[in-house]
């Protein structure tokens, strides 16, 4: 039984719920990548899946927009996997347990993966319908963003034609960020040594403190 079935936009929520049912933590993206490929096949869309599990899906512009400049929609397939102490979910094999309270979607005792599962859900919902006018679309879904943008770094961009990209991975709803400096991951190693220090050590404690009365 659907947990998100009463929420809008309905098709976006449908795909988000399906995505949440597939294990897709960083480094464990084969199943979610294959899910996107199956979607493309089912909807007779051209696709590319590389050895890293990145997926690109193409859709022609609808009538009247066939010759418009293509637009790229980009998101990532992996999520951050964290859970509360005592939660027995295995992120390698299990989907998430979704719940809705006061219209807010969360996952029971785990991270939700809205970053960036909602981008994938929006992309698939757009790909399945011709209800909205759009130019040719290039849907680029990369992997392992959360651990260093590894999929994006490895992606062969030569098949892509779009000069305009919308990255669906912002922090604030209703806000657009125009241009970006990108991201950098660095591993820094410094020599570390300890020396026994001379001198005396003191422990200080404060007790029986009284807060001032505010009139």
Task: Provide a role label for each language-model segment.
Residues 65-147, 152-163:
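Active-site metal-coordination/substrate-binding segment of hydrolases
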Residues 3-103:
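Acidic/His- and Gly-rich active-site-bordering loop/insert found
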Residues 22, 26, 106-115, 175-178, ...:
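Flexible, glycine/proline-enriched loop segments at strand-loop-helix junctions
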Residues 17, 21-25, 41, 45, ...:
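Generic secondary-structure signature for well-ordered alpha-helical cores
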């Amino acid at each position: 039984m659907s947990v998100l079935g009463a929420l809008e936009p309905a098709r976006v929520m449908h795909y988000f719920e399906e995505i949440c049912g597939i294990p897709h933590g960083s480094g464990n993206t084969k199943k979610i990548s294959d899910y996107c490929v199956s979607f493309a096949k089912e909807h007779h869309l051209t696709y590319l899946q590389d050895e890293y599990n990145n997926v690109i899906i193409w859709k022609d512009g609808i009538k009247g927009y066939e010759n418009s400049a293509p637009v790229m929609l980009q998101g990532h397939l992996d999520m951050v996997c964290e859970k509360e102490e005592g939660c027995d979910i295995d992120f390698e094999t299990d989907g998430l347990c979704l719940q809705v309270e006061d219209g807010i979607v969360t996952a029971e005792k785990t991270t939700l993966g809205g970053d960036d599962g909602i981008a994938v859900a929006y992309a698939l919902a757009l790909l399945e319908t011709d209800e909205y006018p759009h130019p040719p679309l290039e849907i680029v879904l990369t992997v392992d963003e959360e651990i260093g943008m590894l999929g994006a770094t490895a992606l062969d961009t030569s098949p892509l034609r779009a000069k305009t990209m919308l990255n669906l991975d912002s922090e604030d709803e209703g806000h657009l960020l125009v241009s970006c400096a990108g991201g950098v991951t660095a591993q820094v190693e410094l020599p570390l040594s300890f020396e026994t220090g001379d001198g005396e050590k003191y422990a200080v404690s404060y007790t029986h403190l009284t807060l001032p009365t505010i009139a």
